[in-house]
Amino acid sequence: MQSSHVKNETTYNIPLLINENVISSGISLISLWHTYADEHYRVIWPRDKKKPLIANSWVAVYTVQGCGKILLKGGEHITLTGNCIIFLKPTDIQSYHCEGLVWEQYWMEFTPTSVMDIPLRQQSIIYNGDIYNQELAEVSQLITSSDSMINNLAVAFLTKI
């Protein structure tokens, strides 16, 4: 599989938050992406990042549908399927790609503003997937607002879900 720039690889790859961090409710959200990828989607990390890699940040990847695979430094592979979330250290990620025909996911990079007990590399199933997906869609709408108060509300809502 050939790697190319992520913008040319997806059905859509929407940066919902990328220009500035939004701080609320214990986290500083660095970036939020909603990606609907096809079988050609392959990203070498952190080459695709639009912002500098921050060592103390976290990445949460929530798979809405389909299947994706993340390759970590050291050779470990993590396969993600629908209604599943995982938290990773961005410095551990080597690459990721769509594993199959489609991979719809939300990619969130954030730094905690307080001590958080986050389970690293442990996939968690979201059993109320339809509700969770609807809430993420609402966060996506709020985070794109030009009003900073609404952005803060979106991040607070994100930490709640």
What kind of feature is each model-predicted range?
Residues 1-78:
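Generic protein-terminus/edge-of-domain signal
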Residues 43-44, 116-124:
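Short, charged, solvent-exposed linker or helix-capping segments at domain edges/interfaces
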Residues 106-109, 113, 128-161:
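An amphipathic alpha-helical interaction segment
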Residues 62, 72-74, 90, 98, ...:
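Residue-level recognition of conserved beta-strand positions in structured domain cores
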Residues 85-87, 100-117:
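A short hydrophobic beta-strand segment most commonly corresponding to one strand
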Residues 74-89:
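Short acidic-glycine-tyrosine-enriched beta hairpin
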Residues 40-48, 82-83, 91, 100:
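Tight coil/turn sites that cap or link beta-strands
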Residues 68-69, 85-86, 90-96:
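Histidine-centered metal-chelating micro-motifs
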